Amino acid sequence: MRNVDYEVVRTLRCRNLNAPGVLGKLTTTIGQNGASVGNITTVSLGHNFNVRDIDVIVRNKEHLGQLLSQVSKLREVTVLEVRDAVLNLHENGKIKMINTVSVNSMDDLRKVYTPGVAEVCKLLVDDANWKDYYTNIPYSIAIITDGTAILGLGNIGSVAGMPVIEGKAALIQQLAGISGIPILLDTTDQNEIVQTAKHIALTFGGIQLEDIASPRCFVILEQLERELNIPVMHDDQQGTAVVTVASLINASKFSGIQLQEAKIGLIGLGAAGLSIGKFLLRFTGNPSLGTARTEASIRRHVEHGGIASSLEEIMQTADIVVATTGVAGLIESRMVRKGQVIFALSNPYPEITPEAARAAGAAVATDGKAVNNLVGYPGIWRGTLDAKASSITFEMYMAAISAIVDATADGELAPNPLDPKLHLTVAHNVARAALDSRVAQRQLDNDYFENTTIKQPPR
């Protein structure tokens, strides 16, 4: 098993001779030294020299140094500056609260604030349901984390996890028009987390739990679902399960392995793995084999209808293997059987790379970069809030899966997560399922389902 390094993205500002083939020689050198080329931006074009910003993706800082050493040997190229593209993008954060109205005069001020706002307050005193018309509560969600399970970084704390939570908020705003408000908790006590969420729930139309370690995340989700009258989702559980099942359905189209007939093995039974197992059981009617590092995790899997197994048994007998352990390199090439479907979903590095799995005989192999929760949660939340659903039912998640499968191009495992039409389709499917499940508190007419862009329905 290899040591894990995190990918590093840097921008090289390069001054190169304005001659045919020089740029090609530079990008070839980058590729030959094991780095990937990202965006190339022209800064200036001159008679003798051109200046370009070239994004490169390397394994670590040592690899970057080796790359720069090789580039320096190109006589026609000078590296003027090395910049951290990711840090530059995150400067001052990725989100901010903005007004939906302008205050440009005293008349505006009197309407937006005092004394005019008192009329709206009195209306809500008489009937709190007017909040759906006169506040942004229905289209705001709390994104709550205690920082104990941040991506592949683990227990790094809430503040260190804020860039991840900001990213979720930015994406759900762009793709679904929903205000995601980061809530960083300075506690890991499950009772305090539940109580905090309950105390602030009046501010929001829904609550998304994020990056909370198992097993506490299971108890927190179940308790909030039971005690709140607004929808609650844990993206690491249901969000991951939705996109994984959708991608497995897509994989069956060109692997020849049908989910309902396949033996499925789950390696890793934390928030993601356990939820994937529960979804697969509901979808296929068949239990999955499951293994994990702790007996408690395996016991929970069995309690939810799964079968206790081992890494060796799963790799030797399962048609489909889904790994969510967070342990890079756990699955060795020699373990892969010809024709298997391998989903190694841990980030930033998978249990086995798709290339290695395919080389070992896997019919289909992918990782967590390709199977991305982003294809699911924006549309799930949009449809849920549009229907003013009191909860998110399994049928609503299945409706999201169906929409994702239908939106996926032939030969692909998942659709483009940045396609606005995808999230609109998911939202419509989820909203219709909310109506059918009788958890919708808002009736939606045909005009809503015929909308071609995401916009708020009549309230």
Task: State the predicted function of each range.
Residues 151, 158-176, 228, 234, ...:
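Glycine-rich phosphate/diphosphate-binding loop of Rossmann-like nucleotide-binding domains
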Residues 235-236, 346, 351-444:
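Adenosine-phosphate binding glycine-rich loop
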Residues 22-23, 135, 151-153, 217, ...:
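Short glycine/serine/threonine-rich phosphate/pyrophosphate-binding segments
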Residues 1-91:
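A conserved regulatory-domain signal marking ACT and ACT-like small-molecule sensing domains
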Residues 304-365:
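Rossmann-like adenosine-cofactor binding region
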Residues 79-260, 381, 385, 437-439:
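Glycine/serine-rich phosphate-binding loop and adjoining beta1-alpha1 elements at the start
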